[in-house]
Structure formats: C-alpha cells, structure tokens
C-alpha cells in the first residue's frame, strides 16, 4: 500500500471558471463562447429589432421595416447618416445622449450590429480553434472560416473606414446588399477588378470541386448491402472505408488525363481554392476603400470619344457605370443636393 503525502494544489477562480466553461454539456461553451454567444445574440437581436420597427427615413429617406410595409427582401437596418462620420454611435455618446429612439433614428443599430457581428464571427472562429485543440485535431476549420471573416470585416468595416463615413457601407438587408453591389460597380468598376475575378474563380471553383467530390464519392461507394440504394450500402458506424479512392483516381484519369493521387492533396485543394477566393476578394475591397483603380483602359475611352463608330464592351460598360453614378448619386445621397445638367448625363456614342 502506497500513501502519497503532499499538499493539495489550491484552485483559484480562473480554474473554477475554466472547469465550468469546458464542462461536457449538450452545447459546449468554452472560453470562445464567452465572446461568441453574447455578441451573436445581440447582433441577431439588433437586426430583428431594426428590420421590424426602425425606419431609415432619417438616414436614407427610405422605408426599411416591416412596420412600414417592407417584406423580408426589402427590409434592412440602414447605415448611419453621412454626417455621423465614423463615430461608434454609442447609446451614451454625444450623438444619441442616452435617447434610445434618437439612437435608432441616426443609425446606431447598424453600428451595434456591425461591431457585435464582427466579434461574433471572430468568436465562432476561436471556438473552432478551441474545440480542435481539445479534441486533438488540426485547426484547418478555423483557418477556412477566416475567409468569411475577412470578407465581412473588409466590406462592412474596412471599406466605409476608407470612405467618408459609415454611410457608404452596405445596409443589413437583401435589397440593400444588391444596391451596394450596384454602387461598387458604378463607382469602382468592381467586376473588372482582378481581385474580384480571383474571388469569383475561387467561390465558383470551390462549388465545382464540392459537386465533383460529392458525386465521385457517391459513384464509388462500396456495394456491401443487398439494396441497390447506395445509402444502404454501408453502416454509419463501420470502421472500414466506404468508397474506393483507386476507382475514383482511375475514373478521373480517364476523364482529364490527370487526377489527385491521394486524399490529403485532394482535400487541401478543396480548402485552398474557396478560402483563397474569399481572401483575394477581401484584399480587393480594401483596395476599393482606398479608391485604387484597376483595369482602366483609357486608350479605348479616348478613341471612343473621338470616333463615334468605335465601341467595345469595355466602353459600353464605362457608359453604364457613368449612368449608375449619375442616377444613383442623387437618389442615394439626397443630402448632397446633386443636380446634373442634361449635357453631363451619360449617352451612347450614337446619340
């Protein structure tokens, strides 16, 4: 019989909290949950409150809530007024002075949702890091989720920080996001930006890879059962592999002439393509925030201005962008009192 003599290690307050947050329960909390759950709850609650009750009349001159007759596609929590600059619009700040109604009217809910939403997304990423460490796996899920975080932060925070105010960020709504896309095209020629092209290639390429991968796995499932249905060809708890990598490799070698040689390279490529697309899009948006130009083919514009018979798809798109700027600016920024004389409004070369 062995008797161990020693002093029991004292447990401080940190150890007690650490035990509680990491306790095995239906929904794991963890240290990241202390950031994730409150911020996500407040961001979602603020968005539901804003789309239900809060008008955008004082910031954009628009109706934007269910209470005013909007539906799910047209409601939004709009950005603050241009005059607010880059103020955090705290409820107790000098703009609202503790008045909740005034705070909603000047766009305080948008700042509330944007900041809490950003921290909520970061908390979700940290949650994946934390659980991966506890379970003992690699943190590639968290690395992959950095892509959506980069896009959200660049679009909703970095872009308006590079512009005059939060006013130029997207409002939180479906139709509002569409309006923001038109704005980016008209004022930044976004679709011709190489970072946008890389982003589209990454996202659509990732979707294609997912479709091909899922179909290939379904095609090569082992037919161990009696039924013809591939979903009954294996038991979910079996330890053996359920599909043939060799058969899949042979199939795609015949289709393309090349195929992935192992699963590690295949799945890393499926991770790399969409995440790289998201990150390049985020870099492009930061460039737009700084008003950097890309792919301006001035020589074609000059020739089109001199020769009425010369026109390319690029020059036609430039005219469309001018139209977006001319018609959107007056509607989107009524506080500027834009008045465009007839001679500056865009028109085709043939007119």
Curated annotation (Swiss-Prot):
**What molecular functions are annotated in GO for this chain?**
chlorophyll binding; electron transporter, transferring electrons within the cyclic electron transport pathway of photosynthesis activity; iron ion binding; oxidoreductase activity
Q: Which UniProt keywords apply?
A: Chlorophyll, Chloroplast, Chromophore, Electron transport, Iron, Magnesium, Membrane, Metal-binding, Oxidoreductase, Photosynthesis, Photosystem II, Plastid, Thylakoid, Transmembrane, Transmembrane helix, Transport
What does the record note about the cofactor? The D1/D2 heterodimer binds P680, chlorophylls that are the primary electron donor of PSII, and subsequent electron acceptors. It shares a non-heme iron and each subunit binds pheophytin, quinone, additional chlorophylls, carotenoids and lipids. There is also a Cl(-1) ion associated with D1 and D2, which is required for oxygen evolution. The PSII complex binds additional chlorophylls, carotenoids and specific lipids.
- For the keyword Transferase, the answer is no
Transmembrane listed as a keyword? yes
Record-listed chlorophyll a ChlzD2 binding positions: 116
Transmembrane stretches, by residue range?
39-59, 123-139, 151-164, 206-226, 277-293
The cross-references to Pfam families, in alphabetical order and at most eight, read:
Photo_RC
Catalytic activity field: 2 a plastoquinone + 4 hnu + 2 H2O = 2 a plastoquinol + O2
**Which residues bind a plastoquinone per the record?**
213, 260
Extra info from the record?
2 of the reaction center chlorophylls (ChlD1 and ChlD2) are entirely coordinated by water.
The protein's matches in HAMAP family, at most eight in alphabetical order, are given as: PSII_PsbD_D2
According to UniProt, the name of this protein is Photosystem II D2 protein
Q: Which organism is it from?
A: Gracilaria tenuistipitata var. liui (Red alga)
């Amino acid at each position: 019989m062995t008797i161990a003599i020693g002093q029991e290690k004292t447990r401080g307050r940190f150890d007690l909290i650490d035990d509680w947050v990491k306790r095995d329960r239906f929904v794991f909390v963890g240290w990241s949950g202390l950031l994730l759950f409150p911020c996500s709850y407040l961001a979602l609650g603020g968005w539901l409150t804003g789309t239900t009750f809060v008008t955008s009349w004082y910031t954009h001159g628009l109706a934007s809530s269910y209470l005013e007759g909007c539906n799910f596609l047209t409601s939004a929590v709009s950005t603050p007024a241009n005059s607010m600059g880059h103020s955090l619009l705290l409820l107790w700040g000098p703009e609202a002075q503790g008045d909740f109604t005034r705070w909603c009217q000047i766009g305080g809910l948008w700042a509330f949702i944007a900041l809490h939403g950003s921290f909520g997304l970061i908390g979700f990423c940290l949650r994946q890091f934390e659980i991966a460490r506890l379970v003992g796996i690699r943190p590639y899920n968290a690395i992959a989720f950095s892509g959506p975080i980069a896009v959200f932060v660049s679009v909703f925070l970095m872009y308006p920080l590079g512009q005059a105010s939060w006013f130029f960020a997207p409002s939180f709504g479906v139709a509002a996001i569409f309006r923001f896309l038109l704005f980016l095209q008209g004022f930044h020629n976004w679709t011709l930006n190489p970072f946008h092209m890389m982003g589209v290639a990454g996202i659509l390429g990732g979707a294609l890879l997912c479709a091909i991968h899922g179909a290939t796995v379904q095609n090569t499932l082992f037919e161990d059962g009696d039924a013809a249905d591939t979903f009954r060809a294996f038991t979910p708890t079996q330890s053996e592999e359920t599909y043939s990598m060799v058969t899949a490799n042979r199939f795609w070698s015949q289709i393309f002439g090349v195929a992935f040689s192992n699963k590690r390279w295949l799945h890393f490529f499926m991770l790399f393509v969409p995440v790289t697309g998201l990150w390049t899009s985020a870099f492009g948006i930061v460039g737009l925030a700084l008003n950097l130009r890309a792919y301006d083919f001035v020589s074609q514009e000059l020739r089109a201005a001199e020769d009425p018979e010369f026109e390319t798809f690029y020059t036609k798109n430039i005219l469309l962008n001018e139209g977006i700027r001319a018609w959107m600016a007056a509607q989107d920024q009524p506080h500027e009192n834009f008045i465009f004389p007839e001679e500056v409004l865009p028109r085709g070369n043939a007119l």
